[in-house]
């Protein structure tokens, strides 16, 4: 296995209530489980003092990028990918609904693929969401599979491991700044010939999550945009 050198990237929007606990837990784990690491928080124009809290409480222990205005999860992660200094990047949601220890399952597959994605819906995965969110998520996943990229149980899981050079290659072609960036990147990975592994993980439901019903409508619009971009030839041609 390669050395465990990792950027752990948290996109954050109005996460002042829980970001400190997330970072404390992640730092404690990283100190004992990684050879080299950096924790990177990209504040996406928060209005609740998230960035100030991170800077004041963690100082040099955590790298902080402040975006002046909200651009969307995809835009925030792109900023983090551009700034990452380690050869692998783990994307994780700021609520740590997927325990950081689940990284071990992804890392075990890193020798076989430059992209390893966690999956709440794959056989062996655990999804502790309310029934309505499970239903809407499953419906959306079917639409994504039929319209953009197939073969995955869960494109939207926020826990993903990318080799940094591959992530940067994909983000050069990224056009979606919202939640749809997840399946856009996987579609690009397929077109550019990068292997992707999907690993079942355990996802806990955290109160106060930031995904609203409106977000599902936004994702629907992003699916339409990606289909339009494909028709207009705005993505790289698929490699044979």
Residue locations for each model-derived region?
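Conserved donor nucleotide-binding strand/loop of the catalytic core
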Residues: 36-40, 51-83
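Catalytic donor-sugar/metal-binding loop of nucleotide-sugar-dependent glycosyltransferases
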Residues: 151, 175-177, 186-203
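A conserved acidic beta->alpha catalytic loop
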Residues: 43-51, 96
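Short, well-formed alpha-helical segments that are part of the catalytic scaffolds
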Residues: 15-30
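Acceptor/aglycone-binding surface of glycosyltransferases and processive sugar-polymer synthases
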Residues: 67-83, 88, 100-179, 206-215, ...
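Cell-envelope/extracellular polymer assembly enzymes that use nucleotide-activated donors
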Residues: 5-7, 38, 184
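Donor nucleotide-sugar binding loop of glycosyltransferases
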Residues: 15-18, 46, 73, 99
């Amino acid at each position: 296995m390669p050395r465990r050198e990792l950027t752990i990237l948290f996109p954050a929007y109005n996460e002042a209530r829980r970001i400190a606990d997330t970072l404390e837990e992640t730092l404690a784990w990283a100190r004992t489980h990684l050879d080299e690491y950096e924790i990177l928080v990209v504040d996406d124009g928060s209005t609740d003092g998230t960035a100030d809290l991170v800077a004041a409480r963690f100082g040099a222990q955590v790298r902080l990028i402040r975006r002046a205005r909200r651009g969307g999860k995809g835009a925030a992660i792109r900023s983090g990918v551009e700034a990452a200094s380690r050869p692998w990047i783990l994307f994780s949601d700021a609520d740590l609904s997927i325990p950081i220890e689940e990284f071990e399952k992804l890392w075990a597959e890193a020798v076989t693929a430059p992209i390893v994605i966690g999956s709440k819906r794959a056989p062996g995965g655990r999804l502790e969401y309310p029934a309505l969110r499970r239903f809407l998520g499953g419906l959306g996943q079917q639409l994504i599979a039929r319209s953009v990229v197939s073969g995955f149980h869960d494109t939207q899981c926020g826990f993903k491991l990318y080799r940094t050079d591959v992530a940067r290659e994909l983000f050069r072609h990224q056009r979606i700044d919202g939640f749809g960036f997840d399946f856009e990147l996987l579609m690009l990975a397929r077109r550019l010939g990068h292997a992707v592994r999907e690993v079942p993980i355990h996802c806990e439901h955290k109160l106060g999550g930031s995904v609203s019903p409106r977000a599902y409508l936004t994702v629907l619009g992003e699916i339409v945009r990606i289909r339009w971009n494909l028709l207009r030839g705005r993505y790289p041609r698929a490699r044979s």
